Amino acid sequence: MGKYNLILSEYLSFIYNSQSAVQIPIYYSSNSELEDRCIEFHSKCLENSKNGRSLKKLFTEYSDVIENATLLSILSYSYDKYNAVERKLVKYAKGKPLEAGLTVNELDYENNKITSELFPTAEEYTDSLMDPAILTSLSSNLNAVMFWLEKHENDVAEKLKIYKRRLDLFTIVASTVNKYGVPRHNAKYRYEYEVMKDKPYYLVTWANSSIEMLMSVFSHEDYLIARELIVLSYSNRSTLAKLVSSPMSILVALVDINGTFITNEELELEFSNKYVRAIVPDQTFDELKQMLDNMRKAGLTDIPKMIQEWLVDCSIEKFPLMAKIYSWSFHVGFRKQKMLDAALDQLKTEYTEDVDDEMYREYTMLIRDEVVKMLEEPVKHDDHLLQDSELAGLLSMSSASNGESRQLKFGRKTIFSTKKNMHVMDDMANGRYTPGIIPPVNVDKPIPLGRRDVPGRRTRIIFILPYEYFIAQHAVVEKSVIYAKHTREYAEFYSQSNQLLSYGDVTRFLSNNAMVLYTDVSQWDSSQHNTQPFRKGIIMGLDMLANMTNDARVIQTLNLYKQTQINLMDSYVQIPDGNVIKKIQYGAVASGEKQTKAANSIANLALIKTVLSRISNKYSFATKIIRVDGDDNYAVLQFNTEVTKQMVQDVSNDVRETYARMNAKVKALVSTVGIEIAKRYIAGGKIFFRAGINLLNNEKRGQSTQWDQAAVLYSNYIVNRLRGFETDREFILTKIMQMTSVAITGSLRLFPSERVLTTNSTFKVFDSEDFIIEYGTTDDEVYIQRAFMSLSSQKSGIADEIAASSTFKNYVSKLSEQLLFSKNNIVSRGIALTEKAKLNSYAPISLEKRRAQISALLTMLQKPVTFKSSKITINDILRDIKPFFTVSEAHLPIQYQKFMPTLPDNVQYIIQCIGSRTYQIEDDGSKSAISRLISKYSVYKPSIEELYKVISLHENEIQLYLISLGIPKIDADTYVGSKIYSQDKYRILESYVYNLLSINYGCYQLFDFNSPDLEKLIRIPFKGKIPAVTFILHLYAKLEVINYAIKNGSWISLFCNYPKSEMIKLWKKMWNITSLRSPYTNANFFQD
C-alpha cells in the first residue's frame, strides 16, 4: 500500500529542507482504543514541535500507532519564504539558454518574443494565448522534476540512462527559465503582465509542455524525439505539431497486412490470417518525401531520420516508433490563436463560381433525403417528442453561456450572469420568454464567439447562440441521433459500439481487389461553399417532412427548426479585437448548434456518396462500406480485378479531382491496407490510437477545483498510457500531492494520504494501482469512506436563496406541470434538484461550495468523525461477499493475437488470454422496458439512479409513477402485472451495478467480461433463484480474477460457497446502494 505515502514523505523533506520545517503524520483507526492512541500521538507531536523538541522519541513510544493505524494525512509547516525553486533551479541551469527565432511563425504574436514587445502596455496584455489553464504552477512543475532528479541521481544500469536523458533535457529547460527567472503565478494560477513583461511570452506553456515531455522519456528514441520537440517548440508555436504528424496519413498505407482481426456477423472480433499487400504508387512516395522535406526545412533532423529509416522495410514490428512520434507531436501544447485570425481563417478561402453545380445539386438532395429518412417515422406518427419539443428542450437545457451578461433578480438578490438556465427563468418571470420567435443573428445582433483549441490544428470558433436555438433544435436532433444509432454508416453514433468494432469493419473487406478511400473533411465542414447547400438541404428536407403530418405542434417544431437554418444563412459574428468589437459577416458553418455533430455527419455522408457516384461513372466497383466518423469519412471499394499501382494512382487522382470540382479543400487518400482518421488509425492490420492528451496544459479554464484537476490529470495519464504514451508515474503522483494539498495558513499545509485519495469516496482522485479500481473492504477503509460521506455535499447560501425565490420556484413548477399528469414527487424533486445543480456553473456558488468543502475537509483530515449511516455503498456489498470466496492457482494460455500494439504489457496479456469486447455494456438502464415505456409517452428521461429507486418501489407506487408521466393506465397495469417487470428489476440493478463499478471506463472497457475463458475460472454452485445475487457474485469474481491478473501476470480461480441464508439478506441490501460521485468518476466521465 504505501508507495504514495513514502514518496509524499520524501517530497516534503525535499521541499521543506530547512531547520524550521516540521512534518507531523496524522493517523486514524476504526479500532476505538487505537484511535485514542492516535489522538494522543497527534497532540504530543504538536506540543513537541511547538516547543522545538524532536519527534523521534514519540515515534518509538507510539510505534503501535505507526504500525497498526492508517496514515490519514501529513501536516507540514515551514517558515522559510518560498524562493526555494529559484535556488534549486540554479544547480540545473548549467546549459546554454534557448534563443527564440523571432520570424519562425507567420503571425507575429505566435513568435515567442519578449512579452512587452508583443504587448507594450498592461492594458493590451492578455494571457489567453499562453494560459496553461491548469490549477498548478510552473514552479510546482519544476519542483516535481527536481525532486525526481534528486531522488534518482544514484540510479544504476538502465535506470541511470533514463536519469541522464532526463537530466540533459531538464538542463535545457532550467537554463532557459533561469535566464529570465521563474514566472510567479497569482492566486488563480495565472501569469500577469508585471511578471511576464520582461520574459518570453510563451515561456510558461512551453516549459510545462517540455516538462511533460521530458518526464515521459524512457528510451534513447524518446530522448531524441523529446529533445527535438522541446528545442523547436520554443520558437515554432504554430506548425510544429502538424508538420510532425502529417506523414502518418501516408505511413498507414505502406504496411502489408499479415493477419488481422475482422468483425464477424455477431459483431465480434475474430482473427483472420489474410495477407494483403500494400500497393503504393510513386506519387504517394513523392508526397511523403515532400512532407519529410518540410520537416527538415523547419529544423527537424532526428524525427525525419527515424521515419526515413523505417521506410526501408516498412515493417509493422517497428511501426510503434512511428506511432510514438505521432503521439509525441501533440505534447508540444495547444495552439492558441487570436479569435480574429481563427474566424478569418475560414473566410480567406476564395469563393469561385467555377464549381460543378450538378454535384452540388446531388449533394444537397442527398442531405435532404437523409434528413427525411431520419425523421420520416417520428413525423408520420406524430411522435410526442416532436409535439412537446419545447418542454424537452427546457428539461435538457445546459447551464452554458447564453452569449451576454444580464442583470437578473431572484427574490431580493440581484446577480449578473450569462448562463442559459438563469436567462430562461428570468425571461419566464418577466414575460419575455418567446420560444416561438427565433432571434435573428444578423448585423443587428451578431453572434458572440467561444473557441476550441487543439494541438496541431488552428483555433476554431464556436457560436454561442441564444437559447431559443437550442430549444428549437433539441427534439429534432435527438430523433436524428436515434436513427443514426442503428445505422452503421454513422460510426460515431452506432449502437453501443466502441472503436474496436469500427476497426474490424474496415479490415473485414480489405483484400487484393479492394481499396479504401479515406478523407479528412474538417476543412470542408467550416468552408463557405458548404454553408448554402448544407442549410438548403436541411430546409428542403424539413419542408418535405412538414407535408407528411397534420399535427400543428409537429409542424410548428419543424418550422422553428427551419427558422434556425434560415437565420444562420445570414449570420454575423462579433469579435473583440483589442478594445473594439468587430462585426464580421460569417458565411460558414461553425460548431455551437445542437445539430453540429449530427448535421455534419449527414453532410459528410452525403459528400462521400456524391464523390463515389461520380467516380463510379469511370470505374466498376462495389462499395462494401461507407462510414462517417466526426470530421472524417472512409469507404472500402471492391473491384473485379486485382488492384495495381496504376489503379490506386488513378482512383486517387480522380477522387481528388472530384473534390476539387466542388472546391472542397480536403485531404483525400487511397490505400489498400490502412487508414488514418482523427480518432484512430489502422496500420498493418492493427489498430492504434493517438496518445495526445496534454497533462500540464489545458485547453480552457472551467470551474473545477484543484482536486478535480488532479483526478483529470491522473485520468489523462491513464488514457495516454493505454495508448502508448507513458509519463513517469512518480512524477504524476508528485503532481497529485501538490494539487491535493490544502493550505491552512501561509506556513501550514495539510497533505492527504494515499488512503484518503484512493478510497472509493466522494474525494477519490486516483487508483493505488494503475488500471485496477479497488473497492476497499477493510475496517479502516470502510470507516474513512463513511466519514467522507458525512461531509459530501455542501450547502451554498446563494444557491439556497435563488432556489427559494419565486422566479426559480415558478420555473420548476411550470416544468413539472407541463410534464406531469398527476402528482409525482420523485420527478418533481428530481427536476428541482437538477435545476439547482445547474446553478453550480455560476462561479460565486461553486466558490462558496468549494470553501465549505475545504473547511470540512480540513477538519476531517485532522480527525475523522464517522456517523452511523443507513447508506450502503458498493464496498459494503463486496465486503459481505468477500469472505465466502476461496482462491486457488490457475492457468490460462495466451490464445489471441495482439491487435492493439500500444497497450501496456499487463493489459495486453489479459486481452490475449480472455479476448476483447466490441460493445459498451449498457449501464444507463435505457434498454429496460420501463425506460422504453416512459420514452414512448413522455419526454422525461429518468437517470439510472432514479430508475433504480423507482423499480424497487411497491407495485402500486410504480403504477402511479407511470400514470403521472402520461402512460395510459392500461399500459401501466399491464407492465406491473407482467413478467417484464421482474426482468426489469434485474436488468436495472445490473445496469446500476455496472455503472457503479465503472465497467465502461479505463482498461475494463477493453476486456470481454463474458469470455468463456474467464467464466471457467469461476465456480459458484447454483443455490436458490435470486439472479441478482448470482450476478453480483459472478461480477465480483470476474473483477477479482482480472485485477489479480493485471497485477501479477498470472491467473487465479475462485470458488464461492455462498450460504442460502445470506442470499436474501444480500439481495435486500442491493436495493439500497448509494452511488458516490467523486473527482475520479467525474474525470472518467469527462474522458467520454
UniProtKB/Swiss-Prot annotation:
Domain of life of the source: Viruses
UniProt-listed InterPro entries: DNA/RNA_pol_sf, RNA-dir_pol_4-hel_dom, RNA-dir_pol_luteovirus, RNA-dir_pol_reovirus, Rotavirus_VP1_C
Compartment annotation: Virion
Chief location bin: virion
Enzyme class: transferase
MF GO annotations: nucleotide binding; RNA binding; RNA-directed RNA polymerase activity
Domain RdRp catalytic: from-to ranges: 501-687
Entry cofactors: Mg(2+)
Single GO BP term: viral genome replication
Keywords recorded for this protein, A-Z: Magnesium, Nucleotide-binding, Nucleotidyltransferase, RNA-binding, RNA-directed RNA polymerase, Transferase, Viral RNA replication, Virion
EC identifiers of the protein: 2.7.7.48
GO cellular component, one term: virion component
Catalytic activity, reaction form: RNA(n) + a ribonucleoside 5'-triphosphate = RNA(n+1) + diphosphate
Role according to the record: RNA-directed RNA polymerase that is involved in both transcription and genome replication. Together with VP3 capping enzyme, forms an enzyme complex positioned near the channels situated at each of the five-fold vertices of the core. Following infection, the outermost layer of the virus is lost, leaving a double-layered particle (DLP) made up of the core and VP6 shell. VP1 then catalyzes the transcription of fully conservative plus-strand genomic RNAs that are extruded through the DLP's channels into the cytoplasm where they function as mRNAs for translation of viral proteins.
Oligomeric form and interacting partners: Interacts with VP3 (Potential). Interacts with VP2; this interaction activates VP1. Interacts with NSP5; this interaction is probably necessary for the formation of functional virus factories. Interacts with NSP2; this interaction is weak.
Family: Belongs to the reoviridae RNA-directed RNA polymerase family.
Protein name from the UniProt record: RNA-directed RNA polymerase
